[in-house]
């Protein structure tokens, strides 16, 4: 899969979120679709529609390709995707309205509530509703997380003799660390939040995380951009990344050369959610696609792309389980409890990081 592309989907700063949230016009759709149909009825109507058009769900992202292929084989659905960011997906839904060319999209969890508030989504809970954690779904089914990411450490063992297992290990180490551009990158901002959580903070108190990275900067240990190219060249000692990126990068470069762990004191988990376009021309194929994404087969497809399934009860094959980190590594990882507070905090991070961390750059 295109791993580099995977983390770039998260390069959405608070500016894009706040701009979208401020632009709702409250208009409604003339395209009324029943979302309480049985799965049998949805399947019948989906086969009649025959096509599902997605946005932000390309073949190369999280192994979507197998899900689209299987929907084609099992239900004779044709598929087309237009790749774009979460913000662009919502803008497209809103701009096109009744002239919709997209039926379903995949967005960062922060964009789910915005899409609902802007009246752009069609609710559908699926057969797996009770297995989805409360934090990972809208109460009415307007958005549902399909897979998660948790902040992890990716260590180049050629450069670091004892790979860090905890934030405390990094604090006491002498190697360089990379999180990327925290002024704009969603992944880097979550890395700061994860560090904050480990040292007593939370989504409304990011200061412990800022202090952690400021100390690294003062020591000249905060370096570089954690790209595949830089990692391959050996320019990064420890990268702090989503677990799916760490695992994907390791697979892409050299399985034996890199160590991947979830920090033992704690980390933060976030996710990506499907949204069904309220104005969709093929609403039932979109519902069926969401249903399939949350099925055992759909969840396994995502896991093959190193994305961790949202359903804990899903039965993955042994070969696919081996692609992911052990479940016990996640025992101290937790999701953002208050998305609105986190949204406000992300607006403050660029200035805090610039004034308290980057100022010490060496």
Question: Predicted segments — roles?
Answer:
Residues 19-22:
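C-terminal motif of bacterial Sec signal peptides marking the signal peptidase cleavage site
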Residues 176-184, 292-316:
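Periplasmic-binding protein-like
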Residues 39-52, 57-78, 249:
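Short, polar/charged alpha-helical segment
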Residues 53-68, 80-94, 98-236:
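Extracytoplasmic ligand-binding site segments that recognize negatively charged/polar headgroups
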Residues 110-116, 232, 238-257:
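A ligand-binding cleft/hinge motif common to bilobed small-molecule-binding domains
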Residues 331-362:
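Conserved C-terminal helix/tail region of periplasmic/extracytoplasmic solute-binding proteins
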Residues 24-26:
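Bacterial signal peptide processing site
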Residues 152-159, 192-198, 270-282, 293, ...:
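A bilobed periplasmic-binding-protein/Venus flytrap-type ligand-binding module shared by bacterial periplasmic
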């Amino acid at each position: 899969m295109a791993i580099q592309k995977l983390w770039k989907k998260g390069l959405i700063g608070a500016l894009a979120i706040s701009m979208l949230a401020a632009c709702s016009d409250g208009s409604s759709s003339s395209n009324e679709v029943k979302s309480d149909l049985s799965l049998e009825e949805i399947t019948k109507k989906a086969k009649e529609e025959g096509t599902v058009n997605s946005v932000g769900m390309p073949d190369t992202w999280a192994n979507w390709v197998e899900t689209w292929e299987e929907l084609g084989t099992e239900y004779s659905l044709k598929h087309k995707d237009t790749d774009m960011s979460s913000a662009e997906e919502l803008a497209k839904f809103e701009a096109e309205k009744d002239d919709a060319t997209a039926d379903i999209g995949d967005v960062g969890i922060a964009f789910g509530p915005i899409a609902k508030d802007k009246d752009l989504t069609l609710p559908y809970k699926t057969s797996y509703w009770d297995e989805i954690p409360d934090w990972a779904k809208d109460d009415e089914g307007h958005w549902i997380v399909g897979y998660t990411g948790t902040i992890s450490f990716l260590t180049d063992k050629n450069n670091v003799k004892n790979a860090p297992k905890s934030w405390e290990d990094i604090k006491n180490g002498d190697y360089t660390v990379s999180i990327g551009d925290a002024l704009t990158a969603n992944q880097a901002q979550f890395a700061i939040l994860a560090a904050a959580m480990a040292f007593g903070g939370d989504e409304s108190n990011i200061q412990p995380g800022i202090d952690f990275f400021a100390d690294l900067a003062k020591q000249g240990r905060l370096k570089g951009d954690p790209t595949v190219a830089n990692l391959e060249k050996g320019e990064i000692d420890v990268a702090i990344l989503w677990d799916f990126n760490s695992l994907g990068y390791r697979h892409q470069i050299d399985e034996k050369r890199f160590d991947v762990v979830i920090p033992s004191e704690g980390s933060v988990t976030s996710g990506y959610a499907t949204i069904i376009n309220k104005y969709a021309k093929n609403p039932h194929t979109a519902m069926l696609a969401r249903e399939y994404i949350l099925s055992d087969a759909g969840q396994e497809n995502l896991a093959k792309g190193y994305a961790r399934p949202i359903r804990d009860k899903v039965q993955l094959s042994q070969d696919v389980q081996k692609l992911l980190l052990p479940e016990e590594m996640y025992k101290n990882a937790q999701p953002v409890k208050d998305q609105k507070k986190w949204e406000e905090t992300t607006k403050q991070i660029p200035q805090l990081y610039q004034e308290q961390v980057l100022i010490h750059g060496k």
